[in-house]
Amino acid sequence: MEHWLFYLRAHLLEALGFAQRSITSYQAALRIKPEFHRCSNRIAYILAGLGRYAEAEPYFLTVLAADPGNASAHFNLGYTYDKRGEFEQAIRAFSEATRLHPKLDRAWYGLGLSHAALGQHDRAANALREAATLQPMNPHAWYQLGMAYHTLQDRDKMDAVVMHLLRFDPKITRQLIRDAKRSDLDYLVKDLAA
């Protein structure tokens, strides 16, 4: 029961914004009950949120050793790999997350970004299309999908992305048009203030 007291204290400290103190309390709970993987998951999540990705990794791996079907933990592990530039490992983790939970849009998004970082733009487009389909109002997924199509020199698909994105986020649409150097589409966003 004592491990729960440390867990609840840590949870409160985390909610109040005391990240390091909450980690210390979660670690105390783990010393009492090492198989209390909720604590490992929270520690990993906090460390990743602090940008301490290498420190977060072993905690995510501990969670996954106990619960290999945890799609969110696979996603979070992929995120830590992606942030460290370890894109092949990120792809493996994101792929497992999407296999376990095919509607986990953020895993598809991360998968697309990791493929793009490796220059695998066709695979990136496939993953980003899934992310955009699952979250049709996510301008970042649509922007990245448009850039993947631009890199693949698929003007028709990129134009379709621009037209879709224009309906709900003209500013991101303008950014996509500029970044893709598609001045032929400037007329769509000419009324936006610079």
What are these regions (language model features)?
Residues H3-W4, H37-R38, A71-S72, D105-R106, ...:
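Helix-start (N-cap) detector for alpha-helical repeat units in TPR-like alpha-solenoids
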Residues P102-N126:
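A contiguous binding-surface segment within folded domains or other stable secondary-structure elements
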Residues M1-A28, R38, R42-G49:
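Alpha-helical segment of the N-proximal tetratricopeptide repeat
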Residues I32, A66, L100, L134, ...:
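Structural marker of alpha-solenoid helical repeat scaffolds
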Residues G146-Q153, I172-A193:
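TPR/TPR-like alpha-solenoid helical repeat scaffolds
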Residues A15-A28, G49-T62, G69, K83-E96, ...:
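Structural signature of tandem alpha-helical TPR/SEL1-like repeats
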